[in-house]
Amino acid sequence: MRSLNKNARHQASGFSLIEMVIVLAIIMVAASISFMSAGPVMKQQRVTNAYTTTLAAMRLARGYAVAQRTSYSVAFANAVSPSPYATVTVAPVVGGLFQGERNTVTYQLPQDVSFLAQSGLPTASTAVPDGYGSGATAIDFGWTQNGIGTGGQSTIYFCPDGSSQRAPGTNNDGSCPGTWDGGVVYLARAGDLLSSRAITVMGVTGRIRGWRLYANTGGYQWQRQ
């Protein structure tokens, strides 16, 4: 009898094959759900990283220009084959005795994020970020402080007084010629309108601001970050 009871206890312990299959199935379903949920989050995080990188590069350039009493350029470019990356390049203006101390640095954005103004963005002058352009040009600098100008410029220059201008000075003292240059740059994942971000620069002050697109009743609206 003792032997029979001992065997019975051994048979009752552990998991049966059916129970193990059920547990494995539950784990696989949970893992699949987690993977599907993580996909959109990772995509959004890459957009956030691109936005943060671009914003930081612009603020660094302005800070360098003020601290070193010279001019720094910031150039924006989408991917050019064979490179799959959009880039932001910060560089000291070369020439004269007041050349910046920092070397040229190029920042790469995540591969699925580019400088992009997608169809569906607000286009009215009262609805675009800080009133620059019409929401149709991805890299759109070259506007004066009151929103007048041609736009479409892809390079801006930060100057010793903190302002943003369209060209560096030519008198070799690090100054700028006084042509204030503001504008906006848009970033997004292609086909994902609500991933859109924007960064504006006010020419006369060099103020840099970030924006994010949100859906509202009847359309979309930019909100400052």
Question: What positions do the PLM features span?
Answer:
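Alpha-helical hydrophobic helix detector
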Residues: 20-37
